[in-house]
Amino acid sequence: MYIYVLGSAAGGGFPQWNCNCPNCHGVRTGTIQAKARTQSSIAVSENGTDWVLLNASPDIRQQLFEFKAAQPARKLRDTGIISVILMDSQLDHTTGLLTLREGCPMNVWCTEMVHQDLTNGFPVFNMLKHWNGGLQYHEINPKQAFKIDGFENLEFLPLIIKSAAPPYSPHRNNPHDGDNIALIIKDHKTQKQLFYAPGLGKIDDQIMQIMQSSDCVMIDGTLWTDDEMQQTGVGTKTGREMGHLYISGEGGSLSYLNKLSTPKKVLIHINNTNPILNENSSQFAELKANGVEVAYDGMQIEL
């Protein structure tokens, strides 16, 4: 299995266009050691030619330009992107579908809850209906494994996770199963497994077992502390109120990751305020000392 990180930041990217927090100001002026990042999305493949896109960020055009394997150039109009899987209906994970309209019809896999949001609150399925067949909806049934045509060896098993629907969704304060999923992606040829959960709000025993049995885990790294938005003065909500598990301290994701013998542990979907973006920070050093990597745009993993 080939994994390519198209984007590794949370909504707004890094630096965020209107933000002058220490991280954004620092990367913009070159006064901190940090990499600029686009909004989170990854691509997976079994052969390095045909790819499944996991989430479609607003930065998708630039991401696919940087990702050379996405354009095999076999004919006048071409792409290596075969299908899109949506983990949720967040704007930073779905607005890229509008940019992909020239490639319609496009197969899009998502849960019924996500499909409801994307036909009502943000009706992208309706908007693109007249673009050469539009978005072709394939329902993801939580807890039921599925395969995608063209990917003989990859199996996708969705898992319901605790998180939050987007602010525009009627499910925001009335959560439903299927608002957010994680994916277990199994390569039956190599017998390797990826656990991907960029919107993880809680880690329970089941998720710990799945992560322990995986060869690579790539999970939510939005915030270092639960009150980071408040402490930096850029917001009023905690990470948990937004559906994101913080990294540090008791109950943080790092305390769980440290219990795993999983070969590769990666944090993705990183907010612009998170100190781990500064590669000279003590927080970045702490992750490195514990064998946890910080995803960056263009990161490549082979399982």
Swiss-Prot record:
Presence of the UniProt keyword Transport in the record: yes
| Domain of life of the source | Bacteria
Task: Keywords in alphabetical order, please.
Answer: PQQ biosynthesis, Transport
Pathway, per record: Cofactor biosynthesis; pyrroloquinoline quinone biosynthesis
Q: Biological process GO annotation list?
A: pyrroloquinoline quinone biosynthetic process
Functional note: May be involved in the transport of PQQ or its precursor to the periplasm, in association with PQQ biosynthesis, but is not absolutely required for this synthesis.
Query: What family, per the record?
Result: Belongs to the PqqB family.
Q: What is this protein called?
A: Coenzyme PQQ synthesis protein B
